[in-house]
Each structure stands twice: as structure tokens, then as C-alpha cells.
Amino acid sequence: VDEWYINMDWRKKIKKIVDEINWIPEWGQEREHEWLDNMGDWMISKKRFWGLALPIWIFEDESYYVVGSKEELKELAVEGWDEFEGNSPHRPWIDKVKIKHPESGLIGKRVEDVGNPWLDAGIVPFSTLKYNTDKEYWNEWFPAEFVVESFPGQFRNWFYSLLAMSAMLEEKAPFKNLLGHALVKAEDGRD
């Protein structure tokens, strides 16, 4: 199955902001560094219907174009904008938009893939704290003061996606303090 990946040649940026965080317990910092040192490229796509629509359009010559904003999408759109406008940027509305490649002039359609859920999780601060629309509000609430989460799995999932997005977009940590705990179980020992 073909998937989409982000080349992680910028992991040093992520490692730098890992060191800005107060990790409780302290070994969490080392664990995150180990993950970053040993990870491959980041698979960002899934073969699903619902999810974060990847902003990638593909053309008949198999070239592709990544659209950088809603404004750019509107500018490039040659079909389907009226059906899309006013709806959320998800399927089926986003898939109605066809664009003209700014260099080749070919008409393309969006790839059917959606984003990996952890890619989506990494942009939560950006999508909920008005990153694109109210910088004063954004600066008041970002970075978060405190995150509490179970350690198992989150080093390569939620923490990683938050760190990656923040490193790329803001070049600073998405939270100041992280309290990690073991898996919490029910009284009878079930997860």
C-alpha cells in the first residue's frame, strides 16, 4: 500500500525543543531522544474516509502539489470551490475541489488519503488556539503550562507529533512541563 511520508531530516530541531521541557520523571527526556534518534521517516497517511484531509493534489503526469493554505487553494481552484466553501476541510467537500498546477497547468484532484491520527493530534494547539486568526490569543495560551499523560506509547505518538509540529512551525516546545505516569488500570486489573 502506497503511503505518504515526511522526511525527518529536521529531527535536530525537534531534539532541541525536547530539552526545553521539564520532564517528570526526568528519564522521559532521554526516552524521547532515543525515539527521535532511532525513528524513520514519518508515515502521515491512512487509507480511510474520515480524517484530516491531506492537502496534496495529484496530476495525470503523476506529479503532485502540496497546497499551503485555504487562500492558496481558492486561488488554484478551477472546479468545486463553490461546493467546498463554507464546509469543513474534510471529505467529501474538499475532494470536490480540482486545482490547476501553478507550473504545469495540469488539472489535478486531491489524493484520497487522510492524515494519520497522530498527525492530526499534533496540530491540536494550532487548530484550537487560533494560530492563524488571532496571534494575541495564541501567544497568551501557547505553549501549554502542563501536560499529564500516560507514558507507554506516547513518546512515539502524541508527544512526538506535538513536538514535531511545534518544532517546524514555532521552533519552541508545545508545553513547558510534562508529567508522565504508568498505565492506569481498573481495580480488577483491566486496562
Language-model segments: residues:
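Structured secondary-structure scaffolds
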Residues: V1-D191
